[in-house]
Design a protein with these regions (language model features):
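Conserved GHKL (Bergerat-fold) ATPase module
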Residues: 1-434
């Protein structure tokens, strides 16, 4: 892309035939200079002189091995207080945060410098592609010097603002199309919300929170939608979410049956984002649908009364723990729930699981949590009719069979029943229907 044509010999160019030429006559040719560079790339032109197809053609010129079209582009053009031109592209991004091979390229006066733009471009935007051209970026200096340079700070701030403005305009001009692209661009936006406070503020107007049913809300829309049903007795808004629509299906359906909205939050940095939102917004908390039973996740003034006495609950708890055995890692909780709810439910405490996820995805959480085993609670619904049957069963064989069946169904619902235990459950289930 150097600003002067670079000639590499000559090439033969075929010209159109004259109108009076015969069909068998060969087409005329001429020798022309073989120019091997593009001295007027798209970023040197005015945005008004370019069409959408011109931007796509330039993307293919930059990244010939990329076969997917970019989702959209941002044309950068400023001459005060610094000089900078360029085009940034939002590619389709996968869920992992691994560094991509094709990155933003840095030029000075159309001369290629590097594709390592850390310190110049905000970290969350290094996942984008494209070109930045600026004579005001100092070269051959340390990264710490680069990050402290006043011009570079202004350039970084300008790029962040332009990206935020572009996303905001896309959202306002064609929300339906923006929603369709959300899953392909959310990782950049969420990363930006975590790492740049100014971007976090701007993104509040266009960052989306999809539900498991495919509806999309901004945060303010979401608050308005759920405030009546999902505000607990302490006046805190509890936002329920799932990370695996299929794996957590039974928990999702139980929440929907109570009229609750369940968000779909499955990006690798979602635990960090939720913590940021909980600390920056007032009186909100996030809870995954399988973190506890619903009456505990969203506690209301009225509470369920247990059909079992304290003595019966202690007896039942002992019977369940006896079947689980000493090596069991489950913490048994006796809870008065709706009689139509599951007899047994396996839950994963929100705080411990989230700390572990944050540690595994890098940064945050508690040191060493990433290697800790998963923690599960076994919630026993004391109001389910089966609990009375277990307590009143005359033979220990039937009681153990009922407890095992309830336990395995709970583990199956949570995706924890595997291998030999799954095979045993299948055989036992066949025996029951013979």
């Amino acid at each position: 892309f150097m600003p002067v044509p670079i000639k590499f010999g000559t090439r033969t160019e075929t010209l159109p035939k004259p109108e009076d030429a015969k069909e068998e006559d060969p087409a005329p040719t001429q020798e022309v200079d073989d120019i091997i560079n593009n001295p007027t790339p798209a970023w040197t032109k005015k945005p008004s002189d370019l069409k959408d197809e011109d931007y796509k053609a330039f993307y293919r010129e930059l990244y010939p091995m990329q076969f997917e079209e970019p989702l959209f582009h941002i044309h950068l053009n400023v001459d005060y207080p610094f000089n900078l031109t360029g085009i940034l592209y939002f590619p389709k991004l996968n869920q992992d945060l691994a560094m991509q091979k094709d990155r933003i390229q840095l030029y000075q006066n159309q001369v290629y410098i590097t594709d390592n733009v850390e310190g110049i471009v905000p970290e969350f935007l290094t996942m984008l592609r494209g070109v930045i051209d600026s004579p005001d970026i100092p070269l051959n200096v340390s990264r710490s010097y680069l990050q402290a340079d006043g011009a570079v700070k202004k350039i970084s701030s300008y790029i962040t603002r332009k990206v935020g403005d572009k996303l905001n305009s896309l959202f306002k001009e064609d929300r339906e199309n923006f929603e369709k692209k959300w899953n392909d661009i959310k990782i950049v936006i969420e990363y930006g919300m975590l790492s740049e406070d100014k971007f976090f503020e701007k993104a509040d107007g266009f960052a989306l929170y999809p539900t498991v049913d495919g509806a999309y809300y901004t945060f303010s829309e979401l608050q308005e939608k759920v405030k009546d049903s999902q505000t607990d007795k302490d006046d805190k808004l509890v936002l329920l979410y799932a990370s695996d629509k299929e794996g957590q299906h039974s928990y999702i359906e139980a929440a929907k049956a109570k009229g609750y909205q369940v968000l779909m939050m499955d990006s690798p940095i979602v635990s960090h984002l939720m913590q940021k939102l909980e600390t920056s917004k007032e009186k909100i908390s996030f809870a995954r649908v399988d973190a506890d039973h619903l009456d505990k996740l969203i506690q209301k003034e009225e509470t369920q009364i247990s059909k079992l006495s304290d003595e019966e609950k202690d007896k039942l708890k002992g019977q369940v723990e006896e079947v689980l055995g000493e090596k069991s890692s489950y913490m048994v909780q006796m809870e008065a729930m709706d009689s139509n709810a599951s007899p047994f439910m396996i839950t994963e405490p929100e705080f411990m699981r989230r700390m572990k996820e944050m540690q595994q995805s890098g940064g945050g959480g508690m040191f060493g949590m990433g290697n800790m085993p998963d923690m599960y609670n076994l919630v026993v619904n004391t109001n389910h009719p089966l609990m009375g049957e277990i307590l009143n069963t005359k033979t220990s064989k039937k009681r153990i069979r009922l407890i095992n069946q309830c336990l395995d169904l709970a583990r199956l619902s949570k995706g924890l029943l595997k291998g030999e235990e799954l095979t045993s459950f299948i055989h036992r289930s066949y025996d029951m229907v013979k």
